[in-house]
C-alpha cells in the first residue's frame, strides 16, 4: 500500500504546487451577472410569427440585451460582432429572438442541418435557462442559421467526475468522464432561422409546459446565451464565463426577472404502431423469417410544474441508431452508451458513481442482453423532478421472458428493475442516495434471485474553482451470486478548474464481492489512485496559435495486498490548437499490466492469440492531427507505434468528413492495428462509413456501414426519420449483417426491415 500512496502523493504535491503559481489575474473576481426584465405579451396582442424574421412590432416593445463578452480568442474583450437577444413571455409561451449581426454575412458557416447535431462547428447560439434559479440545473436550447433544433438538460452545472477541456456548449468535448449534460432530452418547441444582409436571425417559441418551474408571480430565472462566430472561431457570452467553463456554468448566468408563471396541465400521449420483418439466415430449423405487428404507448403527466410521471407500455426502440463498433485489446468489457429515448430522458437524475468505471445504474442492463440483443419490455414507469426541496427519481421496469428462436423454450428469465434516487441541493452542492434492485420473476426465476445496490454520495462546491465529490456504495445478492455480491465500493475525487489549469485527483476502492448487476463495473477487487493535470496557456505573441494544451494523466490499480494489477500514464507534453480550429501534437503512453490469468486478444475462426499470465510493461508514442472541424473537408490522423505486452504494436487511425452541402455529409474512418506477439501475429481493421442527407431540419436519411475484422462482420444500418414534434414521427429502418471471413456459416447472418410511426398527442 505504501508504494501507491507514495506515488499518488507525489502527483498531488505537483497539483498543489501548480495551483499555487496560478497568476493573480486568474483569481480575479467575476463581474456580477447582468439582470434584465422579461417583456410581457398581453393576452390581446398578437403572438410573434416564428419565421426567423425579427421584424414584428411586438419585438420592438422589448428592450434588447446586446452586451456580449468574448471567452475566446481574447478573454474579457467585447464581442467583435453585435448580438441582440430579446425575451418575451405570454400566452403560456416563452419567446426568444436573436439578431446575430455579422459584418460579412457571406462568411457565415453552416455545417449541420439535422436535429441535435453538434453546434460547435457552425455559426450558432446556445441558451441555458435555469428555471428553478438554483444555480445547478438548466434546460438548454440552441440553433444555427438553418434553424435546427438542439436541446438538452444540465445537472450539477454539467460537472461530473471527468475533466472538461472543451467550452461553449453545443458540442463541447470532455475527456476522462461523462458530463452531467444530457443532449438526448427532446423538448416540444419551435424555431426558425434565416441568413439576412445584416447577419442571421432566429426566433424560438418554447411552451411553458415543455419546462419545469416553480409557479408564482414575479419569478426569477437564470439565463445565459453563447454565440459561436465560427468563421472567426470566436465564442461570446451574454453573462461572462471564464475559460475552463462553458454555458452549463449556470451559477454565472444572468438573472431574468418579472416572470409570471401559471400552474399548468401537462398530459401527453405518445402512441406508436410498428410493423417489422426479421430474417435470421443462421437458423437451421423452423422459419427463418419473423413478422411482427405491434403497438404501444408512452404517457407523460406533469403532476406538478416541477414533477413529471412517465409510463410506458409494450416499449419499443426499433428506431434507435445502431451502436458503433469498437476493437477490444484489453481483458475488460467494452462500454457502449445508452441510445434509447425512454432511458435517456432525465438520465442524469439516476447517475451515481464514476461513469464507465463504477456505475450503480446503467440502463443498458434493462431490455438488452449482454450481447446487445433486445429483450421485450412489458412496461414501466418513471417519476422525476423536484419534491419538497429534493431532486427525486423513481423508475420501475418489467421485462419479459426470452424464448428460443422457435418460441418453444424459455432461455432467459423475466426481471423487474427498480431504481430510487434522491438528491438535496444546498447552494451549489448536493447530497443524495440511491437504491437499485433487480428481482427475477416468471416461471424460470429462482425465488431468491435478486441483486441490490445502494449508496450515498455528495458533490461539494468548495469555491468557484474547487469541487469535491465522493460516494460509498454496497451490493447484496441472492441465489447463485450470494457469496459474490456482498461488498463495498467508494470514491473520493477533487477537481480544481480555472482559465489556465484543470487539476484533479481521486481515490477509488472496489471490494472483491462488489457486484452491481444493473450497473457497469469492468473490474473489481482493487484500490485505484488517479491524477490529471491540464495546462492551457494562450500565447499573445504567436498570432496563429489559439492555445497550447499540454496535459498529463495517471491511474493505477492495486489489489488489497498492495500488489500492482495495472498502471497507465498518458504524457502529452505537446499539443497546439490553431486559431482557426483543430489541434495537433505528440504524446506518449506508458502501461503496466500484471494479469493473473491468460486472456485472448484475438479469437477468430478457431485461431486464438492468448496473453499468458505475467508481468508486462511497455511504451507507445503517437502523433495526431485534427483538421479545422468547420472546414468543408475535414478529418483527423493518428499514428501510434511502440510495444504491446511483450510484442510490437503499430496503428494508424484516419477519419475524413466531407460536407457536400449543409444538408449532405459523408465520412469514412479507418483504424488499422498491426500487432506482433511471441504467441502469434494479427491485424485488426475497423472501417465505419457514415452518410446523412437532411431534407429539412426535421427529416433526414442516414446510413452507418461498418466493417470489423475482429468479428469478421460487415453491418449496415439505414434510417429514415421524418419528425413532427419532440422527436416523434415516421421511422423506417433497414439493418443487414454479414460475415465476410468465416467459411462455416452463411455470408448473410441477418436482415431486418422496420416501419414505425409515433405521434405526440398533447392535452
Task: Name these PLM-found stretches.
Residues 1-11:
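N-terminal secretory signal peptides that target proteins for export/translocation
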Residues 11-24:
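Bacterial N-terminal signal peptides
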Residues 27-424, 432:
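Structural preference for beta-rich elements and adjacent junctions enriched in aromatics
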Residues 207-215, 247-262, 303-307, 346-350, ...:
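Outer-membrane beta-barrel proteins
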Residues 240-262, 402-454, 459-462, 584-642, ...:
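Outer-membrane beta-barrel transmembrane domain signature of Gram-negative proteins
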Residues 263-310, 417-477, 539-542, 547-551, ...:
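Surface-exposed extracellular loop regions of Gram-negative outer-membrane beta-barrel proteins
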Residues 375-381, 387-388, 394-396, 426, ...:
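Large, well-folded core regions of big proteins
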Residues 376, 471-763:
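Exposed, low-structure sequence patches enriched in small/polar residues
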Amino acid at each position: 500500500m505504501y508504494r501507491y500512496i507514495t506515488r499518488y502523493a507525489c502527483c498531488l504535491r505537483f497539483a498543489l504546487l501548480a495551483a499555487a503559481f496560478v497568476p493573480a489575474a486568474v483569481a480575479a473576481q467575476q463581474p456580477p451577472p447582468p439582470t434584465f426584465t422579461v417583456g410581457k405579451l398581453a393576452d390581446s396582442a398578437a403572438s410573434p410569427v416564428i419565421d426567423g424574421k425579427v421584424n414584428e412590432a411586438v419585438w420592438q416593445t422589448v428592450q434588447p440585451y446586446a452586451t456580449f463578452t468574448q471567452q475566446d480568442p481574447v478573454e474579457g474583450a467585447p464581442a467583435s460582432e453585435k448580438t441582440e437577444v430579446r425575451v418575451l413571455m405570454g400566452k403560456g409561451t416563452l419567446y426568444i429572438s436573436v439578431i446575430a449581426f455579422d459584418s460579412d454575412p457571406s462568411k457565415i458557416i453552416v455545417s449541420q442541418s439535422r436535429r441535435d447535431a453538434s453546434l460547435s462547428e457552425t455559426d450558432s447560439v446556445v441558451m441555458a435557462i435555469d428555471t428553478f434559479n438554483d444555480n445547478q440545473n438548466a434546460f438548454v436550447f440552441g440553433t444555427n442559421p438553418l434553424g435546427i433544433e438542439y436541446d438538452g438538460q444540465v445537472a450539477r452545472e454539467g460537472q461530473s467526475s471527468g475533466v472538461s477541456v472543451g467550452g461553449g456548449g453545443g458540442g463541447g468535448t470532455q475527456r476522462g468522464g461523462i458530463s452531467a449534460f444530457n443532449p438526448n432530452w427532446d423538448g416540444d418547441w419551435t424555431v426558425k432561422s434565416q441568413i439576412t444582409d445584416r447577419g442571421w436571425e432566429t426566433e424560438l417559441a418554447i411552451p411553458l409546459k415543455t419546462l419545469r418551474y416553480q409557479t408564482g408571480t414575479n419569478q426569477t430565472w437564470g439565463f445565459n446565451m453563447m454565440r459561436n462566430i465560427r468563421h472567426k472561431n470566436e465564442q461570446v457570452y451574454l453573462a461572462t464565463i471564464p475559460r475552463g467553463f462553458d454555458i452549463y456554468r449556470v451559477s454565472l448566468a444572468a438573472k431574468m426577472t418579472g416572470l409570471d408563471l401559471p400552474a399548468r396541465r401537462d398530459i401527453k400521449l405518445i402512441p406508436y404502431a410498428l410493423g417489422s420483418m426479421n430474417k435470421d439466415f443462421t437458423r437451421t430449423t423452423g422459419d427463418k423469417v419473423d413478422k411482427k405487428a405491434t403497438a404501444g404507448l408512452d404517457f407523460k403527466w406533469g403532476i406538478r410544474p416541477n414533477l413529471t410521471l412517465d409510463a410506458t407500455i409494450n416499449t419499443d426502440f426499433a428506431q434507435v441508431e445502431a451502436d458503433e463498433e469498437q476493437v477490444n485489446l484489453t481483458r475488460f468489457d467494452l462500454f457502449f452508451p445508452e441510445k434509447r429515448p425512454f432511458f435517456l430522458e432525465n438520465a442524469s437524475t439516476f447517475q451515481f458513481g464514476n461513469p464507465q468505471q463504477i456505475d450503480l445504474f446503467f440502463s443498458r442492463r434493462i431490455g438488452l442482453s449482454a450481447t446487445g440483443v433486445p429483450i421485450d419490455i412489458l412496461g414501466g414507469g418513471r417519476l422525476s423532478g423536484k419534491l419538497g426541496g429534493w431532486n427525486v427519481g423513481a423508475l420501475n421496469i418489467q421485462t419479459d421472458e426470452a424464448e428460443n428462436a422457435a418460441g418453444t423454450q424459455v432461455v432467459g428469465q423475466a426481471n423487474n428493475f427498480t431504481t430510487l434516487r434522491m438528491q438535496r441541493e444546498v447552494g451549489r452542492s448536493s447530497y443524495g442516495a440511491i437504491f437499485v434492485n433487480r428481482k427475477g420473476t416468471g416461471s424460470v426465476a429462482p425465488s431468491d434471485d435478486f441483486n441490490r445496490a445502494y449508496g450515498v454520495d455528495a458533490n461539494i462546491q468548495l469555491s468557484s474553482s474547487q469541487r469535491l465529490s465522493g460516494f460509498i456504495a454496497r451490493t447484496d445478492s441472492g441465489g447463485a451470486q450470494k457469496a459474490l455480491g456482498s461488498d463495498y465500493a467508494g470514491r473520493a475525487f477533487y477537481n480544481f478548474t480555472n482559465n489556465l489549469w484543470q487539476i484533479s485527483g481521486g481515490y477509488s476502492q472496489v471490494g472483491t464481492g462488489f457486484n452491481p448487476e444493473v450497473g457497469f463495473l469492468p473490474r473489481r477487487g482493487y484500490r485505484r489512485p488517479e491524477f490529471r493535470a491540464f495546462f492551457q496557456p494562450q500565447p499573445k505573441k504567436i498570432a496563429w496559435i489559439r492555445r497550447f494544451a499540454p496535459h498529463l494523466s495517471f491511474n493505477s490499480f492495486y489489489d488489497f495486498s498492495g500488489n500492482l494489477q495495472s498502471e497507465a500514464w498518458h504524457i502529452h507534453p505537446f499539443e497546439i490548437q490553431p486559431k482557426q480550429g483543430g489541434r495537433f501534437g505528440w504524446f506518449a503512453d506508458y502501461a503496466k499490466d500484471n494479469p493473473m490469468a491468460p486472456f485472448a486478444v484475438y479469437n477468430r475462426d478457431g485461431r486464438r492469440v492468448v496473453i499468458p499470465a505475467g508481468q508486462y510493461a511497455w511504451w507507445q508514442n503517437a502523433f495526431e492531427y485534427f483538421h479545422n472541424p468547420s472546414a468543408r473537408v475535414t478529418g483527423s490522423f493518428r499514428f501510434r507505434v511502440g510495444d504491446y505486452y511483450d510484442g510490437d504494436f503499430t496503428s494508424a487511425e484516419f477519419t475524413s468528413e466531407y460536407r457536400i452541402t449543409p444538408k449532405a455529409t459523408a465520412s469514412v474512418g479507418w483504424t488499422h492495428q498491426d500487432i506482433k506477439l511471441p504467441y502469434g501475429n494479427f491485424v485488426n481493421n475497423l472501417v465505419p462509413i457514415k452518410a446523412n442527407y437532411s431534407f429539412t431540419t426535421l427529416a433526414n436519411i442516414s446510413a452507418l456501414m461498418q466493417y470489423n475484422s475482429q468479428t469478421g462482420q460487415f453491418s449496415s444500418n439505414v434510417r429514415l426519420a421524418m419528425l413532427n414534434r419532440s422527436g416523434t414521427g415516421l421511422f423506417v429502418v433497414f439493418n443487414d449483417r454479414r460475415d465476410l471471413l468465416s467459411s462455416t456459416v452463411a455470408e448473410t447472418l441477418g436482415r431486418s426491415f422496420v416501419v414505425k410511426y409515433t405521434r405526440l398527442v398533447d392535452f
